[in-house]
Amino acid sequence: MLYELFLTIVFFFSSFGFNEFNEISNCNDDEVFEIFCGFQNPEDLYLSPSKTKIIVSEFGSLAPNTKFGNLVYFDLKTKKREPISINYEANQWGDDTCNLEDKRLSPHGIDLIERNDGKYMLAVVNHLPRETIELFELIETDVIELIWRGCVDAPQNKYFNDIALKKDGSYYVTSMFDSNI
């Protein structure tokens, strides 16, 4: 039984053309893709509530390196990369013991959800200056703006990777590896 299952899985995956990978090494469109350049290490993408913008986390680096990244969006109408302005207010959604240490980020995984209270929450896995999950309220008009609403510190020696939000504000998070390794 297991052998038949194994053969079925091998046959299934071998039917895909994995060797037909066409690398795009410049910023020129081809017959399949329209290419947009100018992003710094785009790590994760999320469609905005209006479905007219794509939120992009531009990864920087992990500690002990200190290359910071950005949160930006790609406007699907104008086809331009745009910065996201962030306003900082009191920690209302995060852990009371988590404090904003630096306004710069090294964002990784992101998730967006409309909370039970009707507000949009954007959660961002952040690697610098320390491992945190940063919580923002997202306001979308013609542009995207964020209001910092709090953070949650990672357990010691853990590197978060991605996050999945629930409507009540709780979440699931993945850990890439233990930093002691």
Give the role of each language-model region.
Residues 34-70:
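Beta-strand-rich domains and repeat architectures in extracellular enzymes and scaffolds
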Residues 69-116:
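Blade-loop segments of beta-propeller domains
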Residues 48-50, 113-118, 165-168:
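Residue-level detector of Asp-centered blade-edge/turn motifs that repeat once per structural unit
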Residues 55-57, 124-125, 173-174:
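Residue position within the beta-strands of beta-propeller blades
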Residues 60-64, 117, 128-130, 178-180:
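Short glycine/acidic-enriched loop and turn motifs that connect beta-strands
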